[in-house]
């Protein structure tokens, strides 16, 4: 009985914390990869409270996905690109090894559509960002990305500026996890922090 009461107390406190944060819940605790799953041989580790993704010796694709699936949500992340900086944030995605089925919000070097939406192993680019928005990305500095997914409606923002807005029937049917990507080719290092989600 005591164990059940204690677990109930922990659950109640968790609900209170989420409510006090306006419904936002942290996905990264700043200490370890609890709640996440590594796909592939690329490097994912925590350093000075930051989540680091870095190319490994295989120079292959790598992913770090949430153990939990998310349907409708608003996600906020901050990232700092070093070296090539080619990465991405996937949503409603499933994995077979390092083959991912789902949708990616691009995180890439300048002039490569950061904030656009790409469908992996499917239709490719669904929407790229306008050329005049390429200067919103701050290479080598911290950037804030926000992603809102409701049904088949997806909106992305970078540093407070809306990047794309799309309605897609196939996305509406998708189910799966949120994930961060390391692109293949080597030379990639990206830092992440303040990864939080609000389920809608």
Give each language-model segment a name.
Residues 8-16:
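Bacterial N-terminal signal peptides
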Residues 1-4:
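Positively charged n-region of N-terminal signal peptides that target proteins for export
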Residues 20-200:
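Carbohydrate-interacting regions of secretory-pathway proteins
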């Amino acid at each position: 009985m005591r164990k059940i009461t204690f677990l109930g107390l922990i659950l109640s406190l968790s609900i209170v914390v989420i409510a006090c944060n306006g419904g936002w819940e942290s996905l990264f605790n700043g200490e370890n990869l609890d709640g996440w799953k590594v796909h592939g041989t690329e490097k994912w580790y925590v350093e000075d409270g930051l989540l680091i993704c870095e190319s490994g010796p295989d120079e292959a694709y790598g992913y770090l996905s949430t153990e939990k699936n998310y349907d409708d949500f608003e996600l906020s992340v901050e990232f700092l690109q070093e070296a090539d900086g080619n990465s991405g944030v996937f949503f409603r995605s499933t994995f077979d090894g390092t083959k991912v089925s789902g949708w990616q919000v691009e995180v890439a070097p300048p002039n490569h559509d950061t904030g656009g939406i790409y469908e992996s192993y499917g239709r490719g680019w669904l929407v790229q960002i306008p050329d005049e928005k390429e200067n919103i990305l701050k290479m080598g500095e911290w950037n804030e990305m926000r992603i809102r997914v409701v049904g088949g409606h997806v909106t992305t923002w970078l540093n407070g500026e809306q990047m794309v807005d799309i309605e897609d029937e196939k996305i509406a049917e998708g189910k799966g996890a949120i994930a961060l990507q390391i692109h293949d080719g080597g030379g990639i290092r990206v830092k992440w922090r303040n990864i939080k989600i609000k389920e809608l």
